[in-house]
């Protein structure tokens, strides 16, 4: 929303003296710089797109296919031997407590995948005002007279208008354009409920209850204890397995132009047209004004500085994967696998006090005591292109004092015809060869690619500690234990640099 005072319509008169129609209001309105920087604030354009995609899969109902319980197939029952068959105490206990059903006690298996795509594009322009959005007082049209003395037509107003430097560098500040694109893609997968597979719990099938023997059956003290505390669900005590993958793509392009201002956006006082006389002594027609106008070096090199254009593109891609919660598949605690117990030596084996303590507190989950396994891959691609033009200035943008025409004599002593003026004109080398230097164009491209991968936390996959000789001391034994529970992160870095330089001489 622009300035409401610029919208055509009836003027809104303010109080006398301090309103927008007063002397101060007119002066501020004409000099408040309605340029795109709005008093130093850079123009900014931001575009942001967000795409959220969520996919959820729920499996419920009866297990499909002919892989169900054969006991449900119509036909004569097959009794097993007494005591150890499926109808015995142990068979009933195992059948009722293995609970491999997809609902695992009514909870349906659920898989949620969520993808979030955020794309943001930002463009910042600083330095030179772009296009016709400059100072409105420079637009051709009827002049708006201000109050005498302090208005834009007074001595101070004319001096400010002519010397406020409407050039693209705005008093030395280089024009800069930065474009930045950020692409964030995050994918999260959560698995809750029962492990997938059609091997349901037959005890949930409608039918008569099968009571077990007293004491050791599922209704006895041991059965109830196992059923409540063994928690063979994939959530391992309620914590759902979670896998998060996050990709961040940042692309930034920056262009800086230094040296000569491009195009006809230079100093307006150089444009052909009628001269605007200023007040005597301090205006552009005075001794100091003429000296500054002739020696401020409007050449493309701006006093020897070569025009330079730098374009820099940075591409950063980072991928992070975190796995938390329950280990998937058969990588859980081996002590939960059905089978005969393996007795160890007395005292220090898995059945001793220390073994039982370690087995219960060693946290066989992939987090290894809470530290989640994390894999981070980061790729950085930096491409920089630099172009430098030296030698002859291109086109008719050289020193205006070399253009054929009548000489403009300055005041005696300090003008261009005086001792100082002649000295400056002869040694500033405005010739196209700059004292013999040939015009040269150099283009240089640098491409740097860096890839870094850091793996911390629990090692993924079926990696197990390799057998090692027994520790020689307590310190070595403690060091091995600490490395097992807190592995050091492993970092891998790769870097490649590609430099291309092209030189063109005329």
Swiss-Prot record:
Alphabetical UniProt keywords: Activator, Host nucleus, Host-virus interaction, Phosphoprotein, Transcription, Transcription regulation
Sites bearing Phosphoserine, chain numbering: 35
UniProt-annotated stretches for the region Disordered: 1-471
Post-translational modification: Phosphorylated by the cellular protein kinase cdc2.
Xref: Pfam families: Herpes_LP
Signal peptide per UniProt: none
Cell compartments where the protein resides: Host nucleus
The keyword Membrane is assigned to this record: no
Assigned GO CC terms: host cell nucleus
Signal recorded as keyword: no
Family as reported in the entry's similarity comment: Belongs to the lymphocryptovirus EBNA-LP family.
Role of this protein: Plays an important role in the establishment of B-cell immortalization by acting as an EBNA2 coactivator. This transcriptional activation preferentially enhances the expression of the major viral protein LMP1. The interaction between EBNA-LP and host SP100 correlates with coactivation of EBNA2 and the relocalization of SP100 from PML nuclear bodies into nucleoplasm.
Subunit structure: Homooligomer. Interacts with host SP100; this interaction is important for EBNA-LP coactivator activity. Interacts with host HAX1, ERR1 and HSPA2. Interacts with host PRKDC and AKAP8L; these interactions modulate the coactivator function of EBNA-LP.
The protein's name: Epstein-Barr nuclear antigen leader protein
Naturally occurring in which organism (per UniProt): Epstein-Barr virus (strain AG876) (HHV-4)
């Amino acid at each position: 929303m622009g300035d409401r005072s610029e919208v055509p319509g009836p003027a809104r008169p303010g109080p006398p003296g301090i309103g927008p129609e007063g002397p101060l209001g007119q002066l501020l309105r004409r000099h408040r710089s309605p340029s795109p920087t709005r008093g130093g604030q850079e123009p900014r354009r931001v575009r942001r797109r967000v795409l959220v995609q969520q996919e959820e899969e729920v499996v419920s109902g009866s297990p499909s296919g002919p892989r169900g319980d054969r006991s449900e197939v119509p036909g004569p029952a097959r009794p097993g031997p007494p005591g150890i068959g499926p109808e015995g105490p142990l068979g009933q206990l195992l059948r009722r407590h293995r609970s491999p059903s997809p609902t695992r006690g009514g909870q349906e298996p659920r898989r949620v995948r969520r993808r979030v795509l955020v794309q943001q594009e930002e463009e910042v322009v600083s330095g030179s005002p772009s296009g016709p959005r400059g100072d409105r007082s420079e637009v051709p049209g009827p002049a708006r007279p201000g109050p005498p003395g302090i208005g834009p037509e007074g001595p101070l107003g004319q001096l400010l208008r002519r010397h406020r430097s409407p050039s693209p560098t705005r008093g030395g500040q280089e024009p800069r354009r930065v474009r930045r694109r950020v692409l964030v893609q995050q994918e999260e997968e959560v698995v809750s409920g029962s492990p997938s597979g059609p091997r349901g719990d037959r005890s949930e099938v409608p039918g008569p209850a099968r009571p077990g023997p007293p004491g050791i059956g599922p209704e006895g003290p041991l059965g109830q204890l196992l059923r409540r505390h063994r928690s063979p669900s994939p959530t391992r005590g309620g914590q759902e397995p979670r896998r998060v993958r996050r990709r961040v793509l940042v692309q930034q392009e920056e262009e800086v132009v230094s040296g000569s201002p491009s195009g006809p956006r230079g100093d307006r006082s150089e444009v052909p047209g009628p001269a605007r006389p200023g007040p005597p002594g301090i205006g552009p027609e005075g001794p100091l004004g003429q000296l500054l106008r002739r020696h401020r070096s409007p050449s493309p090199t701006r006093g020897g500085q070569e025009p330079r254009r730098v374009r820099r593109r940075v591409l950063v891609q980072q991928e992070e994967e975190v796995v938390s919660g329950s280990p998937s598949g058969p990588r859980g605690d081996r002590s939960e696998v059905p089978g005969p117990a393996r007795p160890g030596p007395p005292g220090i084996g898995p059945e001793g006090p220390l073994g039982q303590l370690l087995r219960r507190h060693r946290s066989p989950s992939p987090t290894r005591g809470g530290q989640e396994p994390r894999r981070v891959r980061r790729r950085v691609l930096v491409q920089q292109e630099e172009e430098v033009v030296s030698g002859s200035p291109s086109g008719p943008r050289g020193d205006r004092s070399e253009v054929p025409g009548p000489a403009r004599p300055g005041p005696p002593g300090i003008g261009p015809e005086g001792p100082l003026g002649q000295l400056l004109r002869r040694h500033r080398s405005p010739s196209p060869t700059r004292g013999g230097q040939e015009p040269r164009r150099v283009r240089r491209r640098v491409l740097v690619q860096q890839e870094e991968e850091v793996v911390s936390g629990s090692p993924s996959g079926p990696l197990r500690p390799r057998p090692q000789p027994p520790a020689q001391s307590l310190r070595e034994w403690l060091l091995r234990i600490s490395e097992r529970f807190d592995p050091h992160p492993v970092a891998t870095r790769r870097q490649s640099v590609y430099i291309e330089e092209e030189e063109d001489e005329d």
